[in-house]
Amino acid sequence: LKFAIQSNDEAITTNGRMAITFLDDSTVKLTEHSQLLIDEYIYDPDPSKAKMALTFGLGTARFITGNLNRIDKQNITLKTPTANIAIRGTDFTATVDELGRSLIILLPDAFGLSSGEILVTTGMGTVTLNKPYQATTVSVFESKPSSPVILDLTLDMIDNMLIVTPPKEE
């Protein structure tokens, strides 16, 4: 389906999956039972006027940035119930459970290198994820994010575990 994305649109999946591609080529892929609110999206050739604000409330999503360098970094916000995520040109997944706890995993680029950097912030501190498969968890906004750890996984394993993309056919 193709339709225009507007501020305050909500994307909710039940037994299906959804992919949303924005005008700057950023993509959000939602798994089953996920909720995403597009608080604000303004695409403008002038990076100082462009803006993206998303709230991810439940489920699992993969965020693949497009030309976010066309949006000033301070104009990009992604929130979960327990964390705020600052995106610095990257590919990552976020999982939010029924209690609002968040798991954030930085994914590698096509060459297996870091795809960028994200800052995960709560009311008690910030951690930086800048290595492939580096992850942090946040239980409540009033606690610091866990120290980053490197997960012993591959992109195919993460895709299959999180059902972010269908398994590859052999």
Describe each model-derived feature in a short phrase:
Residues 1-4:
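Short, polar loop/linker segments at the starts of domains and inter-domain junctions
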Residues 8, 25, 32-35, 81-82, ...:
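Tight coil/turn sites that cap or link beta-strands
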Residues 23, 73, 97:
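Short glycine-/acidic-enriched loop or helix-start segments at secondary-structure transitions
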